[in-house]
């Protein structure tokens, strides 16, 4: 039975490359999400330009709020696809480490 040595795994260059790749995706995505999400309440609290009508009686604030739903769906779909790629990479890494152990 394979017993993982997590310190050894964390020290491997391939695992470090994986973490770098994962961080390169997650950190910018999270920053974008939080900025986009919190900009609506901040902008509507301190500015009035979002109150202007955009399409008929629908204001820019409503369009921004609807865009947040779309952004959430798109970001979660992109993350799900990227996570599948990460899972494949980790599975291959585990197989490589098992091969080195035996």
Swiss-Prot record:
Q: Does the keyword Glycoprotein apply?
A: no
Its primary localisation, in coarse terms, equals membrane
In the bilayer, the protein is annotated as:
Multi-pass membrane protein
Subcellular location per UniProt equals: Cell membrane
A GO-annotated cellular component:
plasma membrane
A Pfam family it matches: DUF485
Q: Which InterPro entries match?
A: DUF485 (IPR007436)
Record keywords = Cell membrane, Membrane, Transmembrane, Transmembrane helix
Specify the superkingdom: Bacteria
The regions listed as transmembrane in this protein's record are 24-44, 55-75
Q: What is this protein called?
A: Uncharacterized protein YwcB
- Organism whose genome encodes this protein: Bacillus subtilis (strain 168)
Organismal lineage: Bacteria, Bacillati, Bacillota, Bacilli, Bacillales
Per the record, the gene is ywcB
């Amino acid at each position: 039975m394979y017993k993982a040595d997590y310190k050894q795994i964390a020290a491997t260059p391939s695992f470090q490359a994986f973490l770098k790749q994962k961080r390169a995706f997650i950190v910018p995505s999270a920053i974008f999400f939080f900025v986009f999400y919190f900009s609506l309440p901040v902008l509507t609290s301190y500015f009035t330009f979002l109150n202007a009508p955009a399409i008929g009686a629908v204001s820019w604030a409503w369009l921004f709020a609807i865009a947040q739903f779309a952004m959430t769906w798109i970001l979660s779909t992109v993350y799900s696809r990227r996570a599948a790629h990460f899972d494949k990479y980790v599975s291959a890494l585990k197989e490589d480490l098992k091969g080195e152990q035996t």
